[in-house]
A protein has these predicted regions:
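Conserved lysine of the Walker
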Residues: 18
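Glycine-rich phosphate-binding loop used to anchor ATP phosphates in small-molecule kinases
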Residues: 57-99, 107
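P-loop (Walker A) phosphate-binding loop of NTP-binding proteins
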Residues: 13
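Extreme N-terminal, non-catalytic leader segments
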Residues: 1-6
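Conserved phosphate-donor/acceptor-positioning beta-strand/loop module used by diverse small-molecule
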Residues: 98-117
């Protein structure tokens, strides 16, 4: 029997709607939100701002910080929402090591739509020029991973409804 979801990780490439979906879920569920971007050290942000893709060595400390944040909340019996690209299986495996059940929602959108979204996004350090490297790195969820893929819809509300349906299904599967 599966356990109920303690941590919901919204994953995917930049511009797929992770932040908007997380805010909508926070408003509906009241769970605290962690933006992975807030866990990056300054050196990582500087690299990405200059259009330089991060290496695994850049990512491991950042991902461990996210995992530790989720585990700390779990010790307080607090369910969480996290936004994190989590592009590779190995990154998701590390995040899955958090205390409590970690459930991934892979938000999927078309590259041209992502370019459009990123062109209109203000105040974000991630340039759209890094999208191709993110797609090259992306390893979609495998059947044996705890999560589902949700198409990032035309409106944030439609995406939110699709995520809620997936979360309800995951929770009912927990029995």
């Amino acid at each position: 029997m599966s356990r109920s979801v303690e941590h919901l990780v919204l994953m995917g490439v930049s511009g797929c709607g992770k932040t908007t979906a997380a805010l909508n879920l926070h408003n509906a569920l009241g769970w605290p939100v962690a933006e992975a971007d807030d866990f990056h050290p300054g050196a990582n942000i500087d690299k990405m701002s200059r259009g330089v893709a991060l290496t695994d060595e850049d990512r491991w400390p950042w991902l461990k910080s996210m995992r530790d944040w989720m585990s700390e909340r779990a010790t307080e019996d607090v369910k969480t929402i996290a936004t994190c690209s989590a592009l590779k299986r190995s990154y998701r495996d590390l995040l899955s090591g958090a205390q409590g059940r970690v459930f991934f929602i892979h938000l999927l959108a078309q590259p041209d739509e992502l370019q459009e979204r990123m062109a209109h996004r203000e105040g974000h350090f991630m340039p759209s020029s890094l999208l191709p490297s993110q797609f090259a790195t992306l390893e979609p969820l495998s059947d044996d991973e705890d999560g589902v893929t949700v198409v990032s819809r035309a409106t944030p509300e439609e995406t939110f409804e699709a995520i809620l349906a997936a979360l309800e299904q995951a929770s009912s599967d927990a029995g």
